Every structure is written in structure tokens, then in C-alpha cells.
């Protein structure tokens, strides 16, 4: 099967994450694959970093413990989006929605403060 990359957005890289002294970054979720709601569906691959207060080991531990729930949420979240929605202009909105959902519905003893995209690819 021929897979063509339709869109590739590397909107935030490891170098930039390391430059922000206010946060530690959880980058171990890995690449999450989902199918868009387009007909026919496209494949989206995303990798995100979750920022939390520097030195907050409780948040890091809780993210580790809840990583399966976070990945499942992200897969479902992007499965409800179309290619036309997954654009740079909507990225700030996505990051805010993702942060709020994780804080309100997945994490119970801690909070993340930032969400950044490390990778966002859409394929045929």
C-alpha cells in the first residue's frame, strides 16, 4: 500500500522544549495513530509533550501511571477530527482542549501546564 504524507508539521522540537526552564516535559507517550473522520479516513500520527512544573515528580509519576488512558483519549480525540480541522490555525485550541481534558478527566492528583506537538503527520 502506498502511503503518502499529505501534511507534516513539526511544530515544537526537543531543542525548544529543553530551552523552557519553567517546565519539565513528559515525552514518553510515543507516536499515536488515529484515523480521521474523513471519508475515506486518513491516518494521523501525533506525538505530544506534556509540560508540568519543574521538579514535580508526583505529576510525572501520575502521567506514567495514566499513560494508557492518555493515549486512548488522544486516539479518540483525533479520530473525531477531519483533515480540514487539523491545521496550524487550530493547534492552540487543540493544545488547550487536550490539556483541559487530561487535567479534568484523567489526572486526579496533579495537573499538566502545557501541551506541545512534537509531530503531526497526516497520510493518505
Where does each model-flagged region fall?
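Flexible, low-complexity charged segments
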Residues: 1-124
Amino acid at each position: 500500500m502506498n502511503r503518502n504524507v499529505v501534511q507534516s508539521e513539526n511544530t515544537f522540537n526537543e531543542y525548544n522544549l529543553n530551552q523552557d526552564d519553567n517546565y519539565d516535559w513528559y515525552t514518553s507517550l510515543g507516536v499515536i495513530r488515529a484515523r480521521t473522520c474523513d471519508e475515506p479516513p486518513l491516518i494521523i500520527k501525533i506525538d505530544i509533550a506534556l509540560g508540568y512544573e519543574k521538579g514535580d515528580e508526583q505529576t510525572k509519576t501520575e502521567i506514567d501511571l495514566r499513560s494508557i488512558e492518555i493515549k486512548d483519549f488522544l486516539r479518540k480525540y483525533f479520530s473525531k477530527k477531519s483533515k480540514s480541522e487539523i491545521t496550524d490555525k487550530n493547534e492552540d485550541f487543540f493544545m488547550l482542549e487536550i490539556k483541559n481534558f487530561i487535567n479534568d478527566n484523567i489526572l486526579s492528583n496533579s495537573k499538566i501546564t502545557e501541551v506541545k506537538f512534537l509531530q503531526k503527520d497526516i497520510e493518505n
